[in-house]
Amino acid sequence: MTKRITTLLIALMCCGAGFAQKTEVRRLEGEIGIGLVNGVNSLTLDNCATGPKLYGELRYNFRMLPIDVGMQVSGSYFWREAESQPERLKSRSYNVMAVADYNLFRGRRVSLFAGVGVGLGVLSMSHPIDIKNPDAHWAGYSTGEGKNKPCFSPRVGVELFNHLRLTVHYMAEEKANNHFGFSIGGVIGGGRKR
C-alpha cells in the first residue's frame, strides 16, 4: 500500500512539474478565514449542532512543482445536545497542523486543489462522554482523559480570483471531536504572477 501511494505521488509530481514550469506563482501566501463545522458522531447524546471555525494559514509555493506547504492554526466549536439537558455541550478543538496542497489546476481566475494537514489538536473533551447525574448545567457529565491528540485533515477546494478560497475538510482527531467543515478564506499574496 505504501509503495502504491509513493508511486502515485511521484507520478503526480512529475506530471505537474511540466505544468508548473509554465505557470509562475508568487512564493508566499497567507490566508485568514471563517467556516462552519459539524460533529460526525453525536456519541451517547441526541444530536450535533453546527458551530464556527476560525483559522489562519501561511503557505510556501514551490517554483517547479504545483505544490505548496505551510502551517495552519485553527479553532473549531460545535455543540452536542441531549433531550434531558436545556443547554448544549460545547466541543472545542484547537489545532496546529503542517499542511500541503497539490494544485490540480491553476488558471487565471479559478484554481483547484487537494491537500492534507497533520498536527496536534488540543481538545476540551474526549470520548467517552458519560452523563451520570444530569442537571441543568452539565455538572453531571464526565469525559475521557485524552486532551492532546494527533489530528489528520484531508481537504479539497477551489481558489477564485487568486484571493478567495473555498475549502471542504474532514478533521480526524479523537472520537468525540471528529468533524466535517466548510470554510471561506481571504488569501494575501500567492496566485499567478502577471
Residue map of PLM features:
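Gram-negative (and chloroplast) outer-membrane scaffold detector with strong preference
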Residues: 52-131, 164, 184-194
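Short glycine/proline- and aromatic-enriched beta-strand/turn motifs that initiate or cap beta-hairpins
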Residues: 20-63, 181-194
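Predominantly the C-terminal beta-signal and adjacent terminal strand-loop region
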Residues: 72-81, 142-194
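Bacterial Sec-dependent N-terminal signal peptides
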Residues: 1-26
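Outer-membrane beta-barrel domain signature
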Residues: 41-47, 83-89, 141-145, 171-173
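Short, well-ordered turn and helix-capping elements at secondary-structure junctions
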Residues: 36, 40, 102-104, 170-172
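Residues that define the transmembrane beta-barrel architecture of outer-membrane proteins
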Residues: 26-28, 48-54, 90-96, 110, ...
